[in-house]
């Protein structure tokens, strides 16, 4: 099967995440898109409480439940240690060697991927589907893709998706200020309790 992977803290999951998954599914003829809430992300200073993690997982479950080709994967959420993309991909290949994996990410992640732990191990494990953002023009994206393909033999495809300037950080900030998050989030999602 052709499996798209969307990882992240999803605090909260929002329409931008779901649109990326849907557009990747259609454009690259994926069989499923797996959403992986990260249980212990290495880039966060404070670890989630069990309650906060359960809240994030439940938000993702609710967000993907009505889409037959979206799946919630608890692979990273169940771990007590930090989860890293390279390791998750290795584990998926060991568990499901028949699958072909497509890692879905935004332009900001494509430009910072060399800072990820053992980032070189990611490239042989998947095709990266990179979605553009407004702040990265197509020339910069093409140059970064060519750089990663040339230097690391990465397989990268450009994901054509709507450019929505939505981030979970913006949503959390708006909610903390008692400002509306209507139409940004789904009705049943909200930032996790701290």
Predicted regions and their residues:
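N-terminal Rossmann-like or analogous alpha/beta NTP/dinucleotide-binding catalytic cores
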Residues: 42-121, 125
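Residue-level signal for inorganic ion chemistry
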Residues: 14, 60, 103, 128, ...
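N-terminal catalytic cores of NTP/NDP-binding nucleotidyl/phosphoryl-transfer enzymes
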Residues: 1-29, 34-39, 106-109
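Residues at the starts of beta-strands that form the adenosine-phosphate
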Residues: 31-33, 100, 127
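Conserved small/polar residues in nucleotide/adenosyl-binding loops
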Residues: 188-194
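Short, aromatic/basic amphipathic alpha-helical patches
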Residues: 140-149
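A short helix-to-beta-strand connector/capping loop
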Residues: 68-70, 151-156
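Short, flexible loop segments at boundaries between secondary-structure elements
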Residues: 126-140, 157-164
